């Protein structure tokens, strides 16, 4: 297995921002959820995908830059999955290509509560999610400097700790069923080659597949 994905500095930064936002959002949500976000952006033309789970404390994602259709508007999709329940879907038209602004709009439109997000130095981020009976004037007056020192000037308490890591969980056992439809026509799939390379749609990991594996 190999990844070998290389993005432009701009796309790499957006992917990191989106993954950071998803981790903070997962921490602000109940434990049993798996959440996936997809953003379809006009400029730069890219489909950005991130997904994570508090159950497994893992997150992964990638950018799709090849054969991407230009959407009429920048679109942001969110899917929340809980075991034994139908996934909850929402979609938003977003004005910018900034993941932080997407997530603030997600809170405004889909979470039914406001959220404030701040990008701090040294790749640190803050997400403040409003709770019932919150002080609206105080909440909306905060800036990045206020957010950076909030633990020092406000009374706070750690409710729980979740430790996320970059991990997709993909492997050949999960990838091979995708090729099940080619089992009866391997010549069309391999085209004379001894092996082919297939890619995980979630993280971009590449796997080498030979005829005897199908």
What are these regions (language model features)?
Residues 130-214:
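Cys/His-clustered metal-coordination modules, chiefly Zn-binding fingers
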Residues 1-158:
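Interaction interfaces in information-processing and related assembly proteins
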């Amino acid at each position: 297995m190999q990844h070998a994905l290389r993005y432009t500095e701009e796309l790499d930064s957006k992917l990191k921002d989106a993954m950071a936002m998803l981790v903070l959002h997962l921490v602000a949500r109940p434990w049993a959820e798996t959440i996936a976000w997809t953003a379809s952006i006009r400029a730069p033309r890219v489909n950005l995908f991130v997904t994570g789970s508090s159950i497994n404390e893992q997150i992964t994602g990638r950018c799709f830059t090849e054969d991407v259709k230009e959407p009429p508007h920048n679109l942001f999709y969110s899917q929340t999955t809980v075991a034994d329940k139908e996934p909850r879907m929402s979609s938003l038209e977003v004005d910018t290509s900034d993941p932080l602004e997407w997530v603030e709009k997600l809170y405004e439109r889909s979470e039914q509560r406001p959220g404030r997000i701040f990008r701090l130095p040294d790749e640190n981020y803050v997400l403040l999610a409003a709770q019932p009976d919150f002080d609206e004037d105080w909440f909306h007056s905060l800036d990045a400097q206020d957010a950076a020192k909030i633990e020092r000037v406000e009374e706070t308490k750690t409710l729980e700790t979740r430790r996320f890591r970059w991990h997709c969980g993909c492997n050949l056992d999960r990838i091979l069923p995708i090729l099940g439809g080619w089992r009866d026509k391997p010549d069309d799939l391999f085209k004379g080659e001894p092996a082919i390379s297939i890619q995980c749609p979630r993280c971009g990991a590449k796997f080498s597949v030979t005829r005897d594996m199908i």
